[in-house]
């Protein structure tokens, strides 16, 4: 017998995988969580530009326009666009009356 075989034998007997065909709820829950984590990580790496762009721009929406007439909305959009077009390198503050 080689030294390698003598060292491996007790480890294989003591620490062998005992979770094959296991119906232990903790093992099942850990497996499901692990698989979901792997799937979410893969999706995050594949679509991270789309996901983070959505959150970045989605959370920076302007004020609510509910109840505001369409003419005032259009005027506000034009003022915003003119401010952006006027100077792209400096911050422009628009005060609404």
From Swiss-Prot:
Region annotated Disordered, chain positions: 60-88
Regulation of its activity: The M2 protein from most influenza A strains is inhibited by amantadine and rimantadine, resulting in viral uncoating incapacity. Emergence of amantadine-resistant variants is usually rapid.
Intravirion side: 44-97
Chief location bin: virion
Virion surface side: 1-22
Membrane topology label: Single-pass type III membrane protein
Annotated GO MF terms: monoatomic ion channel activity; proton transmembrane transporter activity
Source taxon at top rank: Viruses
Lipidation (S-palmitoyl cysteine): 50
UniProt name for this protein: Matrix protein 2
Species name: Influenza A virus (strain A/Memphis/18/1978 H3N2)
């Amino acid at each position: 017998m080689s030294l390698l075989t003598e060292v491996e034998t007790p480890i294989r007997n003591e620490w062998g995988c005992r979770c094959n065909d296991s119906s232990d709820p903790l093992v099942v829950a850990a497996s499901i969580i692990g698989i979901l984590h792997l799937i979410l990580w893969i999706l995050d790496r594949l679509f991270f530009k789309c996901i983070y762009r959505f959150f970045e721009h989605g959370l920076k929406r302007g004020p609510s326009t509910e109840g505001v007439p369409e003419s005032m909305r259009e005027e506000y959009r034009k003022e915003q666009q003119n401010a952006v077009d006027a100077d792209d390198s400096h911050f422009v503050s628009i005060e609404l009356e």
